[in-house]
Every structure is written in structure tokens, then in C-alpha cells.
Curated annotation (Swiss-Prot):
The gene is guaAA. It is an enzyme of class 6 (ligase). Coiled coil: none annotated. This is GMP synthase [glutamine-hydrolyzing] subunit A. It comes from Methanocella arvoryzae (strain DSM 22066 / NBRC 105507 / MRE50). It catalyses: XMP + L-glutamine + ATP + H2O = GMP + L-glutamate + AMP + diphosphate + 2 H(+).
Length: 189
């Protein structure tokens, strides 16, 4: 089976390197790239999918709002999830609970990305900022008692966002979420 090429868009989050390593451990040709890259820079590398990492603030998201509209399968993690929501017309707000902590997640829709993970799971997440309103054409996938929009997907495009960090060991079934995203990329290839 051919290796897929996945680019991890570096939003300067403290676990960005773990996303890169997790994808490599799953047999992917993964590469970290700057969030200041241009759309042309990304497309020249012919990736099969993009993963947007977490990061400290929207102000450090570089060219992310343009990159997240590239026509490829995309997984947004934490800040990447928020960036996706903002770029497609959703709303972001400061969360009531900053810092990393255990969060109990209720899976609302077990779609391609969350297949085999629900109906409940435990994750590691930060809610310094969070998605407050879904963008048009997106559907809710998961929620918690801390945040109403823990995960989302586009209705027709392979765009997925999760508030939590599947790349860290504290997240149950985080590897499965990444494997599910890889399968989405493989089916689209």
C-alpha cells in the first residue's frame, strides 16, 4: 500500500511535533510545514491531506485561513478546529476553562472521523478558545458539558475539526481518530 503524504500545518502548539510523529508512526509520509506557507507552496508538495495543529492564539495562525480552504481532506485540531470554523463563517469565543484538562465527550454523530470512538470518550483538551457557532454547511459531531461544539464536519467536503488533541496519550482512541482521517485521505486519493 502506498504511503500517503500528509502535511502538518504548524500553528506553534506545544504538541505539534506529536501530531507529526503520530502520523509517521502510522506509516505516513508526514512533514511539518509553516503556517506562513502559501497555497502554492503547499500544492507544490502534492499532499493527500492536511492536519492543522493546535497553537497559542488565532493571531499566530499565519496564512491559515487561506490554507484551510485548499481542496484536500483536512483535520483541524484545537486551534486548527477554530481556524476552520472562522474561515468558513462560524464564530469563536474565549472559553470558560483555559488550560489542558480531561474532558468527557459525547459523540453526537459517529461519522467517518469518529467511527468506532463513541458513544462516549475521554480526551485531553484546552478550551482557552472554542467554537461558539457552527459555520454554515457544517454539522455537529461531538459535545461536552464544557463546550457545545467539540467536533464538527462539513456536510459535503472532507473537512473535520476537533477541539481535543488526538495526538496525546491522555486521549482515549486518539490514534483511531487519526487512522480514520488517514482512511478518508486514502479514499479520496
Amino acid at each position: 500500500m502506498d504511503k500517503l503524504k500528509l502535511l502538518v500545518i504548524n500553528n506553534y502548539g506545544q504538541t505539534c511535533h506529536l501530531i507529526h510523529r503520530s502520523l509517521r508512526d502510522l506509516g505516513m509520509d508526514a512533514k511539518l510545514v509553516s503556517n506562513t506557507s502559501t497555497v502554492e507552496d503547499i500544492l507544490k508538495q502534492s499532499p493527500d491531506g492536511l492536519v492543522f495543529s493546535g497553537g497559542p492564539t488565532m493571531e499566530r495562525a499565519g496564512n491559515g485561513e487561506n490554507l484551510i480552504k485548499i481542496d484536500l481532506p483536512i483535520l483541524g485540531i484545537c486551534l486548527g478546529h477554530q481556524l476552520m470554523a472562522k474561515a468558513y463563517g462560524g464564530e469563536i469565543r474565549t472559553g470558560q476553562y483555559g488550560g489542558f484538562a480531561r474532558v468527557d465527550i459525547d459523540i453526537v454523530e459517529e461519522d467517518d472521523i469518529l467511527r468506532g470512538i463513541g458513544p462516549k470518550t475521554v480526551v485531553w483538551a484546552s478550551h482557552q478558545d472554542e467554537v461558539a457557532k457552527l459555520p454554515p454547511d457544517f454539522v455537529l459531531l461531538a459535545k461536552s458539558n464544557i463546550c457545545d461544539i467539540e467536533a464538527m464536519r462539513h456536510k459535503t467536503k472532507p473537512l473535520f475539526g476537533v477541539q481535543w488533541h488526538p495526538e496525546v496519550s491522555h486521549t482515549e482512541k486518539g490514534t483511531l481518530l487519526l487512522q480514520n482521517f488517514i482512511e478518508v485521505c486514502r479514499q479520496r486519493k
